[in-house]
Amino acid sequence: MRKNSAKVTAAVLAAAAVLSACGGSGSSTTTAAAGGSDTAAAETTAAAVADENATYKEELHIAVAQQAPSLDLHKNSTLIARQMMDGTVWEKLVTQNANAEAVPELCESYDVSEDAKTITFYLRKGVKFHDGSEMTADDVVASMNRWIEGFSSAKSTVGDARFEKVDDYTVKITADHSILLLPSMIAGAAQPAAITTAAACEKEDSNGFMTDYIGTGPYKFSEWVQDQYVKLERFDDYVPYGTKGEPMDGWAGYKAAPTKVLEFDIVPEETTRVAGLETEQYDIIYSVQNDDVPRVEGMDNVTVHSLQAGTIALVFNHKKGIAANQYFRTAVNTGLDMDEILTACYGEGGYELGSCYMDAAQAFWNTDAGSENYNQKDPEKAKEILAENGYNGETFKILCANLNNMDYIAVAMEQELEAIGIPTEITTVDWATLTDYRKDPDKFDLYITSFAQVPVPSLKLYFGPNYPGWSDDATLAEKFEAMNTATTMDEAKTAWEDLQAYSWEYLPLINAGHYIANYAWNSDIEGLNTFSGLYFWNAGIKE
């Protein structure tokens, strides 16, 4: 048996703190403005430790750029929902450490069989839900199986296998093939494997979304006023894990919740977010545009943190319309200049070019397979492809959101595509509407989105045939399955390289490059966790 215990040594945690302070793989930087120093800022973000002897300001106000369509993480892949709820309201069987490895959270330990077909999780005892009930195997089985049904990547990984109860504090899943990568999927999925009560799994609205947000995390759901804010309140009966006073290892470890209330204020306009930070209306703001970073860095007592946060994706509609044709996707990919379209959105320095579908922090999975088809910026060749295949000038429909300047990408694409003879039609909506529109194949030929970092390629949602874009290709599915069913990590890496090389031919999407996310906060805040995002489990301002 392959044993994965819950034990985390102080030496490992200390190493993780150093790694976090240095920016991990080199894709993260923190700058303190006039009120602090670079060293102090790095130490603050690395430690993520609350002072139990201090008194903290009662509320933190966090200004975010958009509203989530739902807070049901089982069926919602939007980043903002995860940033609000994952690890805060809901926790998982396992989570990620600083090396992007799956380590216990709601389980004491887990075993992977030698053939990697069976995984057994041994649950922590005495963990309380926000409704006061104790977490048992019945809740975990209901939650995990609901997650599998709602998450195409998990479903394709496990096939017909589902979680089952062994006893009140043990669950397992057994497949007819290797599910080696499943723990990593649980730890870092874009649709988190949140554990809730069995009863909550049964209560859904007319859209199939959960209506009761009951978790085990250090904060409980309080209120959601549409288009205004989401409020979370500290759960005083939270049962922590890890060692009090020691820094977190990635997302794993002790959560003290020193702040009573976390309020996520929905503020679409960046200028309003920045102004609110300056006047201290907001303590933390998301989505600082790259061009505005120098100005925000110049504010008194403000810290700016930047990191490579994910990929910019141009997702084709494979089900219907002109982009369902392979030749057309190839022509579009051949003609586009990624520097031009990314500069339009992020400005210089706000992105990094790169053909790898994975991000810099996932060093094990980095590959240049298929890179010869990336950023060709060859409009003449694109014209030839269109002419050879009888393209007759059908309009190309681009769907985008007026979020973080993503609509600027659409305008830059329009100019480049029309130069090679492709007339375009741009539909610009808010983010919540885009997530609804992209479910309708009649509304777009391509939509523009971004994908946050994930620990394994299995979590790239667009490889699933049910994800909007509908890449229902037999060869793609075969190569994806080969990776997911590998019995060793080396086999999985080889299969991934083969999958990425084919993807740059088939084009489930165009990976335009990697975006840099900028956050800013009041430098008086202590205990922020900046591993692969921004998290508030130990964050607060001392009074």
Model-derived features: positions:
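N-terminal lobe/hinge region of extracytoplasmic solute-binding protein
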Residues: 63-114, 145, 214, 511, ...
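A structural "hinge/loop" feature
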Residues: 64-84, 106-108, 133, 181-192, ...
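Detector for C-terminal structural segments
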Residues: 84-85, 225, 229-230, 308, ...
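Aromatic- and charge-enriched surface segment that lines or borders ligand/interaction sites
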Residues: 108-153, 166, 172, 322-324
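Surface-exposed binding/hinge segments that line
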Residues: 111, 115, 156-202, 207-225
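Alpha-helical secondary-structure segments
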Residues: 136-143, 170-172, 217-218, 256-261, ...
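Structural transition elements
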Residues: 219, 351-388, 405-406
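Ligand-site clamp/hinge motif
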Residues: 240-294, 423
